[in-house]
From Swiss-Prot:
It is found in: Secreted. One of its GO terms (molecular function) is neuropeptide Y receptor binding. Residues 1-23 form the signal peptide. The lineage of its organism: Eukaryota, Metazoa, Chordata, Craniata, Vertebrata. It comes from Homo sapiens (Human). Its main location: secreted. GO terms for biological process: feeding behavior; neuropeptide signaling pathway. This is Putative peptide YY-3. The keyword Signal applies. Pfam families: Hormone_3. GO terms for cellular component: extracellular space. PANTHER family: NEUROPEPTIDE Y/PANCREATIC HORMONE/PEPTIDE YY, PEPTIDE YY-RELATED. Belongs to the NPY family. Gene3D superfamilies: 6.10.250.900.
């Protein structure tokens, strides 16, 4: 009788590795700051814009930042 090779262990390991990689990507993505309401104080607006600026800098930074390209 011919033995049938079942790929269950290989598929399970591949799916587990994929889930670990996706989990690492989710952890590195920053959370977008919540927009303040219309009646917020200037201090809260200033904090929001500073957080938004930091968020945009992190999201749009170049992948080669810090690498010696030349």
């Amino acid at each position: 009788m011919v033995s049938v090779c079942r790929p269950w262990p290989a598929v399970a390991i591949a799916l587990l590795a994929l889930l670990v990689c996706l989990g690492a990507l989710v952890d590195t993505c920053p959370i977008k700051p919540e927009a303040p309401g219309e009646d917020e104080s200037l201090e809260e607006l200033s904090h929001y814009y500073a957080s938004l600026c930091h968020y945009l800098n992190v999201v749009t930074r170049q992948w080669w930042e810090g690498a010696d390209m030349w």
